[in-house]
């Protein structure tokens, strides 16, 4: 039970982290172009 729960939640955490990193990178590029 616990193992399947961890397997199910890990991809969501990884996805959130990936989106956050992409958003930060995208924001840096945008601010860099504006300046």
Curated annotation (Swiss-Prot):
Source superkingdom: Bacteria
Reported induction: Expressed in both exponential and stationary phase; expression is higher during stationary phase (at protein level).
Note: This gene overlaps ybgV on the same strand in another reading frame.
UniProt name for this protein: Protein YbgU
Gene this chain is encoded by: ybgU
């Amino acid at each position: 039970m616990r193992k399947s729960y961890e397997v199910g939640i890990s991809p969501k955490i990884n996805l959130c982290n990936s989106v956050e990193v992409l958003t930060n990178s995208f924001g840096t590029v945008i601010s860099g172009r504006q300046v």
